[in-house]
Amino acid sequence: MTDPQQPNNIKDDLTEAFRLLKQTVKATGVNLIDNYSYREYTATEVLREHLPSIKKSIGRTGDDASAEQENYFKIEQKSGTNENKTLTMSCFPKMMFDKQSDPARRNYIYEYDGFSLSFFEYYVPYPTAVVFVPKEHVAKLHPLFETKQQEKVKDFEKRLNEGKNIGHDAITVSLEEMIEHIGAENMICWLHGNKINSQDFFQQVSNKTIKINQ
């Protein structure tokens, strides 16, 4: 029989582990976390409120998550942190799609049916803020993807004609660009684990009223 207290025990244990880890990092001056896989795990737990069937994919390759009962099969997740004391748009990571020199990889980004961006404060295991793009609005990003890919391919061709290496072959999409193309009202947001009206959330971010890393 499943222990109904297990999720709370896991959260308490994880929080205590990070408290001890922070002490060790201060003592050693060494970053002791390598792959930051905890971020996708805890961000997925936040998204579960909206997507009850969501599952974190195992491994470093492939799609990050899926929620098949809600018809999400390819969810891409990005997370990041920042030293700021106030949460701003620039605190959020950019959505990055690499290997854009490969036509198959360029085509693949149009298959995603959900995107999430998560911001983590330093040595806090659960995200301070999560922004999710639901499948109903993902296609609004496609023209932006296409424009960025065309610019990148043109740069590839120019560099190759000059006998140079193609260089960094990724395209990036910022949260500001996502809002511009999707509309703040069409995104789903959480702050400190609680769902919040997306327009209210972005207004607070714009007004710099959300304190972090205190």
Where are these regions (language model features)?
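Nucleic-acid endonuclease domains
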Residues: M1-Q214
